[in-house]
């Protein structure tokens, strides 16, 4: 069968050239309108194979603007994002700029960036503090010499010694103080033997002071320049305790090298029983201001051992509840003054009639239950009357009315009886007396 080629004329407005290819040729080829014959390829394989390259050209032509946009950004970066200047250096691109910023200007959160002015001020302050501490050390040597002279004329016994306790304040910060405590000679010798390996220079470097004591107490000398901001101990003894201040840092106390061999189960300081009351001691322990011992308050600390149980020394006053004595006691018989003052009331008047049985109960029901279940054989005897006690008749109703002699178990019942029974009787008697007086006068 011969092949047929049918020419198709398109309107002139469809013949638009795009990238050198006309839409007329594309559509004509897609529908098989070409000089080639369809032949046996009516299934469409031939004209589809010829059409795919032309469609791929159209897709490639549409991706050209995206490549142009990327190149535009590159050209923009090359034109403006280069030749940076920082710290007198010329940085060619953004990468060098970021690297320079991270190396020179970036500060991490964990770094402690201190201003230069602050560091200079701190150095000057440290130098001035060092010179001040040197002057204080010289003053301390003079003070210890004077203190030794005072100890020669004081009333302290010969079997005691003075041990300096150096507590560094805030790890060597300005404001240290010195504490001297009078201890027995045995404790002083033990402390000296324990610290014999240390040189005198190291020992003197830990002892610093900022004040001069006014007087050497009989048993304890404490003077402090400033209490520490950490944990402190406050002890208030005597009336003049507010004039002295003593505080120690619990954290720095471990570093001290002059601690005598104390028994830590006891308190460090000992006081006489007449020093302070328990109420004053409780109030002072709760107050935030540290207050310390006066010289007159520690007279008995010389003759007695240095360590003493504070719980046995301080005699606590009875509380308000303990001071108020109760109106009656359960251990002794209760005597009622009003009404029925001649009666004696026992808490458990009903006693068991069985010989050698000391059980007693408040009411008959308790005694009845005991008689049925308290012994091997039930007791069928009737419950007796209340047993006389010490020659007096025990009454279960001790409150008696003075008007009608009626008795009640408690005072409330007697009050109710008086209010509702005898008030009307007394009013009737008053009216009767008024009438009798009127008739007599008439």
UniProtKB/Swiss-Prot annotation:
What are the recorded Gene Ontology BP terms? positive regulation of ribosomal protein gene transcription by RNA polymerase II; positive regulation of ribosome biogenesis
InterPro entries membership? ZnF-Chromatin_assoc, Znf_C2H2_sf, Znf_C2H2_type
Zn finger (C2H2-type) location: 350-375, 399-422
Tell me yes or no: is Ubl conjugation among this UniProt entry's keywords.
no
Q: Low complexity composition bias: which ranges? A: 193-208
- From the UniProt record, list the coiled-coil ranges: none
Alphabetical GO CC annotations of the entry are:
cytosol; nucleus
**Could you tell me where this protein is found in the cell?**
Cytoplasm; Nucleus
What coarse category fits the chief subcellular location reported for this protein?
Answer: cytoplasm
Region Disordered, as annotated, extends over: 193-219, 304-333
Molecular function per GO: DNA-binding transcription activator activity, RNA polymerase II-specific; RNA polymerase II cis-regulatory region sequence-specific DNA binding; zinc ion binding
Q: What is this protein called?
A: Zinc finger protein sfp1
Name the gene for this chain: sfp1
């Amino acid at each position: 069968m011969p092949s047929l080629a049918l020419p198709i004329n398109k309107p002139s407005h469809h013949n638009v050239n795009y990238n050198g290819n006309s839409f007329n040729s594309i559509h004509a080829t897609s529908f098989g309108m070409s000089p080639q014959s369809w032949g046996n390829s009516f299934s469409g394989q031939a004209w589809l194979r010829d059409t795919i390259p032309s469609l791929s050209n159209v897709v490639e032509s549409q991706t050209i603007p995206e490549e142009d946009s990327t190149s535009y950004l590159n050209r923009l970066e090359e034109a403006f994002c280069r030749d940076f200047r920082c710290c007198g250096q010329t940085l060619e691109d953004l990468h060098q700029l970021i690297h320079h910023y991270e190396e020179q200007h970036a500060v991490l959160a964990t770094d402690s960036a201190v201003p230069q002015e602050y560091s200079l001020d701190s150095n000057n302050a440290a130098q001035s503090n060092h010179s001040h501490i040197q002057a204080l050390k010289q003053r301390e040597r003079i003070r210890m010499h004077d203190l030794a002279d005072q100890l020669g004329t004081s009333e302290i016994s010969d079997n005691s010694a003075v041990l300096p306790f150096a507590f560094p304040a805030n790890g060597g910060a300005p404001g240290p103080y010195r504490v001297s405590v009078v201890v027995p000679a045995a404790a002083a010798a033990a402390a000296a033997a324990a610290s014999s390996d240390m040189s005198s220079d190291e020992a003197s470097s830990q002892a610093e002071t900022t004040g001069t004591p006014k007087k050497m107490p009989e048993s304890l000398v404490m003077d402090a320049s400033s209490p520490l901001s950490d944990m402190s101990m406050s002890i208030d003894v005597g009336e003049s305790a507010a004039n002295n201040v003593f505080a120690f840092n619990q954290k720095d106390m471990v570093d001290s090298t002059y601690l005598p061999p104390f028994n830590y189960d006891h308190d460090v300081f000992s006081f006489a029983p007449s020093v302070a009351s328990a109420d004053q001691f409780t109030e002072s322990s709760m107050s935030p201001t540290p207050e310390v011992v006066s010289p007159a308050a520690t007279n008995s600390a010389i003759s007695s051992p240095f360590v003493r149980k504070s719980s046995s020394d301080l005699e606590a006053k009875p509380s308000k509840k303990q001071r108020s004595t109760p109106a009656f006691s359960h251990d002794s018989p209760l005597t009622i003054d009003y009404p029925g003052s001649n009666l004696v009331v026992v808490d458990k008047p009903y006693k068991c009639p069985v010989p050698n049985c000391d059980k007693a109960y408040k009411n008959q029901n308790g005694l009845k239950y005991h008689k049925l279940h308290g012994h091997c054989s039930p007791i069928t005897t009737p419950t007796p009357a209340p047993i006389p006690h010490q020659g007096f008749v025990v009454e279960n109703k001790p409150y008696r009315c003075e008007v009608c002699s009626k008795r009640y178990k408690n005072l409330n019942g007697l009050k109710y009886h008086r209010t509702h029974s005898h008030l009307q009787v007394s009013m009737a008697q008053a009216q009767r007396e008024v009438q009798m007086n009127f008739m007599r006068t008439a």
